[in-house]
Amino acid sequence: MGPSCPVFLSFTKLSLWWLLLTPAGGEEAKRPPPRAPGDPLSSPSPTALPQGGSHTETEDRLFKHLFRGYNRWARPVPNTSDVVIVRFGLSIAQLIDVDEKNQMMTTNVWLKQEWSDYKLRWNPTDFGNITSLRVPSEMIWIPDIVLYNNADGEFAVTHMTKAHLFSTGTVHWVPPAIYKSSCSIDVTFFPFDQQNCKMKFGSWTYDKAKIDLEQMEQTVDLKDYWESGEWAIVNATGTYNSKKYDCCAEIYPDVTYAFVIRRLPLFYTINLIIPCLLISCLTVLVFYLPSDCGEKITLCISVLLSLTVFLLLITEIIPSTSLVIPLIGEYLLFTMIFVTLSIVITVFVLNVHHRSPSTHTMPHWVRGALLGCVPRWLLMNRPPPPVELCHPLRLKLSPSYHWLESNVDAEEREVVVEEEDRWACAGHVAPSVGTLCSHGHLHSGASGPKAEALLQEGELLLSPHMQKALEGVHYIADHLRSEDADSSVKEDWKYVAMVIDRIFLWLFIIVCFLGTIGLFLPPFLAGMI
């Protein structure tokens, strides 16, 4: 053998050792097939197992045992005639909103569901004493329970959380959901209203012969409820029902939860009711405002516009329905009619206030009623007229011009006496004189003894030009007396207008008080306040 023999022997030995150490088919034959990234049955490689990885291997083995040949579309019953009993319960986390206009209630709830799946049972002793597993709900059969009275959004649960699986085959699944359920809103006592909203749950495809519901609790679980700032849950109970629909011959079970919720009225009381009451009280002040100020109509119209704005605000809040008018809407409508009536009454009062003798004659019944007895009933005291002075000639003059006419008469008498003295010194008697008796009559042509007799009787002899002057003075006095009488009649009309204002002042106060009582009394008697 040549020198290459040792090299050949060494190469042969290395090849034999390589064949002995390398497994048949190579390392690729021992490598497990790749699994999908989301495959729940996939498990980490043994080299990646942490300390205590034997438990994970046991769970992996249990998963393979449970879901080998499992069909998630078939009902979990041994026989097709068997019924799956689903225990159902509801837990509310938050009452998000109650939309009165669209008549919807938005809630955040947890649907508690529990049933038995005989295909998912195992013996804990065979699998490391594992008594429960959390499995994705997409891998197992779940009942198709939906919200029947859904108003918007998804009917079924959208967030598929994991289910809690027990060794006895019991499946416990509590998925969260946000539902918008339809609710018939009754706004009769708004904002002191109480609503009764329902949530109806049941299987959409399985009738009572396939799936039957059983309540976990008679009431809604409120342990995790987050209080709302607008609504308070008074009561929430569930009832089991079985109903036959027109579409199908089968009977379908359902569990209906009735939520009795009461509105917290503080916000609406501060921002709506109190301002409305204050504006309504301004209507009363319209009749206390004097007619001479000229702002009565302006105040009435301003109040009417303010109430119109409040009515528009309520229209945006309450649902657009013609079935019932809310109590606050009735109150505002009543107040608007009242304010409109006050405008009409104010126009009439202003018309009465500006009447005069040249345009109207006061009837006797108006003078007797509105100037006599009615003011006494309303506790109105009219100041008495000033005391009139008595004229020496018994002429009734106006108080304001009494002094002027008295002085004029006195001066005339002095002039007449002086003139008579002048004629007496000359030895003559005044050719033409007039006399003024105590009753205001003029006498002319008196002379001699007759004139002396007239003077003794208190009458005065006047010259012709003095007689004309005196007649002018009496004309002025009569005109002033006529103006004084007209002014007195005008004051009577103004007082009649004041009495009418006072009548409606008390009438509006009473009606406003009764309207306020009528606003709060019905909800109080109904137990909503």
UniProtKB/Swiss-Prot annotation:
<dbReference type="GO" id="GO:0016020">
    <property type="term" value="C:membrane"/>
</dbReference>
<dbReference type="GO" id="GO:0005892">
    <property type="term" value="C:acetylcholine-gated channel complex"/>
</dbReference>
<keyword id="KW-0675">Receptor</keyword>
<comment type="function">
    <text>Component of neuronal acetylcholine receptors (nAChRs) that function as pentameric, ligand-gated cation channels with high calcium permeability among other activities. nAChRs are excitatory neurotrasnmitter receptors formed by a collection of nAChR subunits known to mediate synaptic transmission in the nervous system and the neuromuscular junction. Each nAchR subunit confers differential attributes to channel properties, including activation, deactivation and desensitization kinetics, pH sensitivity, cation permeability, and binding to allosteric modulators.</text>
</comment>
<keyword id="KW-0770">Synapse</keyword>
<dbReference type="GO" id="GO:0071316">
    <property type="term" value="P:cellular response to nicotine"/>
</dbReference>
<dbReference type="GO" id="GO:0050997">
    <property type="term" value="F:quaternary ammonium group binding"/>
</dbReference>
<dbReference type="InterPro" id="IPR006202">
    <property type="entry name" value="Neur_chan_lig-bd"/>
</dbReference>
<keyword id="KW-1003">Cell membrane</keyword>
<dbReference type="GO" id="GO:1901363">
    <property type="term" value="F:heterocyclic compound binding"/>
</dbReference>
<keyword id="KW-1071">Ligand-gated ion channel</keyword>
<keyword id="KW-0225">Disease variant</keyword>
<keyword id="KW-0887">Epilepsy</keyword>
<feature type="signal peptide">
    <location>
        <begin position="1"/>
        <end position="26"/>
    </location>
</feature>
<dbReference type="GO" id="GO:0007165">
    <property type="term" value="P:signal transduction"/>
</dbReference>
<dbReference type="GO" id="GO:0045171">
    <property type="term" value="C:intercellular bridge"/>
</dbReference>
<dbReference type="GO" id="GO:0120111">
    <property type="term" value="C:neuron projection cytoplasm"/>
</dbReference>
<feature type="topological domain" description="Cytoplasmic">
    <location>
        <begin position="353"/>
        <end position="502"/>
    </location>
</feature>
<dbReference type="InterPro" id="IPR036734">
    <property type="entry name" value="Neur_chan_lig-bd_sf"/>
</dbReference>
<feature type="glycosylation site" description="N-linked (GlcNAc...) asparagine">
    <location>
        <position position="235"/>
    </location>
</feature>
<keyword id="KW-0407">Ion channel</keyword>
<dbReference type="GO" id="GO:0015464">
    <property type="term" value="F:acetylcholine receptor activity"/>
</dbReference>
<feature type="transmembrane region" description="Helical">
    <location>
        <begin position="265"/>
        <end position="289"/>
    </location>
</feature>
<feature type="glycosylation site" description="N-linked (GlcNAc...) asparagine">
    <location>
        <position position="129"/>
    </location>
</feature>
<feature type="topological domain" description="Extracellular">
    <location>
        <begin position="27"/>
        <end position="264"/>
    </location>
</feature>
<dbReference type="Pfam" id="PF02932">
    <property type="entry name" value="Neur_chan_memb"/>
</dbReference>
<dbReference type="GO" id="GO:0034703">
    <property type="term" value="C:cation channel complex"/>
</dbReference>
<dbReference type="InterPro" id="IPR018000">
    <property type="entry name" value="Neurotransmitter_ion_chnl_CS"/>
</dbReference>
<keyword id="KW-0812">Transmembrane</keyword>
<dbReference type="InterPro" id="IPR006201">
    <property type="entry name" value="Neur_channel"/>
</dbReference>
<feature type="transmembrane region" description="Helical">
    <location>
        <begin position="331"/>
        <end position="352"/>
    </location>
</feature>
<dbReference type="GO" id="GO:0098828">
    <property type="term" value="P:modulation of inhibitory postsynaptic potential"/>
</dbReference>
<dbReference type="GO" id="GO:0005654">
    <property type="term" value="C:nucleoplasm"/>
</dbReference>
<keyword id="KW-0406">Ion transport</keyword>
<feature type="region of interest" description="Disordered">
    <location>
        <begin position="27"/>
        <end position="56"/>
    </location>
</feature>
<protein>
    <recommendedName>
        <fullName>Neuronal acetylcholine receptor subunit alpha-2</fullName>
    </recommendedName>
</protein>
<feature type="glycosylation site" description="N-linked (GlcNAc...) asparagine">
    <location>
        <position position="79"/>
    </location>
</feature>
<keyword id="KW-0472">Membrane</keyword>
<dbReference type="InterPro" id="IPR002394">
    <property type="entry name" value="Nicotinic_acetylcholine_rcpt"/>
</dbReference>
<dbReference type="GO" id="GO:0006811">
    <property type="term" value="P:monoatomic ion transport"/>
</dbReference>
<feature type="disulfide bond">
    <location>
        <begin position="183"/>
        <end position="197"/>
    </location>
</feature>
<keyword id="KW-0813">Transport</keyword>
